[in-house]
């Protein structure tokens, strides 16, 4: 039995109260912006019912940890915390007090111990406080906010006709939104907590029907969610648990106005969890607008760095040499494992994929011009191993959760070091080892110094010619490059 109160602990508490009938839908679009309407909205908010959001009871095992033990544990797992009255981390799943059905799913998934972000993030989230989480992709952050969300829903009154969701998760891309929803379905099924995924590029009908039936958890991209609200298909009056996942990526994609519009329609006493892989000033400023007295947990460093489980190899070459180098590399590493190749443009993605297929390689491509059905099919073929080579633009760089990607190849160097780190982060997930290969040309020279910093921080070898580029020297001519092969990650890949 969980240590939470009865409603939060027992899956039957929500299951028994949850009707199978249709009762969702929306009755309220975005509020007008006049002062009179704003005042009316504030008065309306004052009449909203109270809700529960603090469910954490420290286990005897956690309570017994001394300050020295807490500090040693955080230091060993590279956990940095900020905030008032920060709870101690949990070292085992049973210390969290999750409902039994959640623990069963955790066991079934084969998890051995909480990841660092889960270890510290779960007690913070379950206390009902706002939370800033800074952790690299693949750190386990999705469950760090989803499992407390399930506990939160279980403690709330059931949805009534016309109610919108209780939990809202905003994500930058449909791929990430779909993956989050898959986890929500897996861990929420036993308590009849229902979720849906709202994103553009597909017909609205099935999404509208889900909203009208009533769902406790909505995972959405900002644009399609605004469309649904303004069309009166849902509302945000019941949202008391808000998650912004990959906030840095959403800002990169220009979603700040949409995020502000959405958040302005949610009651201010909500709980907000704000997740980002990096912490630039614009991400911090947005957090200041939305969060109150938050905890902050950082896994590793706020400085941009790559996963140390990834072996990084950088090859200096010319644009005209890339394709032959790619083929030579594939001949060397192809063993049936999944290989993800990143391009800068949709056109380049299609061209290289077409050439690879003509040369007999089992390659497919995914990018923003593909229909959702095409993208789903390509991902399915890649995940199953039927087509173990997938080329992609950055639409797949964030949040793409494909197990056992052994190799990432940056055919084109991305437009930022943040995207470089996120691209190569598709491999080396969940404690596995991975390998990333990067083609680096004279046109990328402005990134050399920062790339060297990332390589050195991760203990990777830096080639003399990349080091020279980092000092501002021009790249060597192609006729002199062979003697530098093999640097950048510690082994030859010629």
Swiss-Prot record:
It catalyses: ATP + H2O = ADP + phosphate + H(+). Its EC number is 3.6.4.13. CDD domains: DEADc_DDX5_DDX17, SF2_C_DEAD. InterPro entries: DEAD/DEAH_box_helicase_dom (IPR011545), Helicase_ATP-bd (IPR014001), Helicase_C-like (IPR001650), P-loop_NTPase (IPR027417), RNA-helicase_DEAD-box_CS (IPR000629), RNA_helicase_DEAD_Q_motif (IPR014014). GO terms for molecular function: ATP binding; ATP hydrolysis activity; mRNA binding; RNA helicase activity. It is found in: Nucleus. A motif (DEAD box) lies at residues 245-248. Residues 325-470 form the Helicase C-terminal domain. A motif (Q motif) lies at residues 91-119. Coiled coil: none annotated. Pfam families: DEAD, Helicase_C. Residues 29-39 have a biased composition (Low complexity). It comes from the Eukaryota. Residues 1-20 have a biased composition (Basic and acidic residues). Residues 1-39, 465-494 are annotated as: Disordered. ATP binds at residues 135-142. Its main location: nucleus. It is an enzyme of class 3 (hydrolase). GO terms for cellular component: cytoplasm; nucleus; ribonucleoprotein complex. Keywords: ATP-binding, Helicase, Hydrolase, Nonsense-mediated mRNA decay, Nucleotide-binding, Nucleus, Ribosome biogenesis, RNA-binding, rRNA processing. Residues 122-297 form the Helicase ATP-binding domain. ATP-dependent RNA helicase involved nonsense-mediated mRNA decay and ribosome biogenesis through rRNA processing. The Q motif is unique to and characteristic of the DEAD box family of RNA helicases and controls ATP binding and hydrolysis. This is DEAD-box ATP-dependent RNA helicase 20. It comes from Oryza sativa subsp. japonica (Rice).
């Amino acid at each position: 039995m969980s240590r939470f109160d009865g409603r939060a602990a027992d899956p039957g508490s929500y299951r028994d109260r949850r009707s199978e009938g249709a009762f969702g839908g929306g009755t309220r679009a975005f509020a007008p912006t006049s002062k009179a309407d704003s005042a009316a909205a504030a008065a309306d908010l004052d009449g909203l019912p109270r809700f529960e959001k603090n469910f954490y009871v420290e286990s005897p095992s956690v309570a017994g940890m001394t300050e020295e033990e807490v500090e040693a544990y955080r230091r060993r797992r590279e956990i940095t915390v900020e905030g008032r009255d920060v709870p101690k981390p949990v070292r085992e799943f049973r210390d969290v007090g999750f409902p039994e059905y959640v623990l069963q799913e955790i066991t079934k998934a084969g998890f051995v111990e909480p990841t660092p972000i889960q270890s510290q993030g779960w007690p913070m989230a379950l206390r009902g406080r706002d939370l800033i989480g800074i952790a690299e992709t693949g750190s386990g952050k999705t469950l760090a906010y989803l499992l407390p969300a399930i506990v939160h829903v279980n403690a709330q009154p059931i949805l009534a006709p016309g109610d919108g969701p209780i939990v809202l998760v905003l994500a930058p891309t449909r791929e990430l939104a779909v993956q989050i929803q898959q986890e929500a379905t897996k861990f929420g099924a036993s308590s009849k907590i229902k979720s849906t995924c709202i994103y553009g590029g597909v017909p609205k009908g099935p999404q509208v029907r889900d909203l009208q039936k009533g769902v406790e958890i909505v995972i959405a991209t900002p644009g399609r969610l605004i469309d649904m609200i303004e069309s009166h298909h849902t509302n945000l009056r019941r949202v008391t648990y808000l998650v912004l996942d990959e906030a840095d990526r959403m800002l990169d994609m220009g979603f700040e106005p949409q995020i502000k519009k959405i958040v302005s329609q949610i009651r201010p006493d909500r709980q907000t969890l704000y997740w980002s892989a990096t912490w630039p000033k614009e991400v911090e400023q947005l957090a200041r607008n939305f969060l109150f007295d938050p905890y902050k947990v950082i896994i590793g460093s706020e400085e941009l760095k790559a996963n140390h489980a990834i072996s990084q190899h950088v090859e200096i070459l010319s644009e005209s040499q890339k394709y032959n180098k790619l083929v030579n590399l594939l001949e060397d590493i192809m063993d049936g494992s999944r290989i993800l190749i990143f391009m800068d443009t949709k056109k380049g993605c299609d061209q290289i994929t077409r050439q690879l297929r003509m040369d007999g390689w089992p390659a497919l491509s995914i990018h923003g011009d593909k229909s959702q059905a095409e993208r789903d099919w390509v991902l399915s073929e890649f995940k199953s191993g039927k087509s173990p080579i997938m080329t992609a633009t950055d639409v797949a760089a964030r949040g793409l959760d494909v197990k056992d990607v052994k190799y990432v190849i940056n055919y084109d160097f991305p437009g930022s070091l943040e995207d470089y780190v996120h691209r190569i982060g598709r491999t080396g997930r969940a404690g596995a080892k991975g390998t990333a290969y990067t083609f680096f040309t004279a046109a990328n020279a402005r990134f050399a110094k920062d790339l060297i910093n990332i390589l050195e921080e991760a203990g990777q070898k830096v080639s003399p010619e990349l080091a020279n580029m980092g000092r501002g020297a021009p790249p060597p001519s192609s006729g002199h490059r062979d003697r530098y092969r093999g640097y950048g990650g510690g082994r030859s890949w010629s």
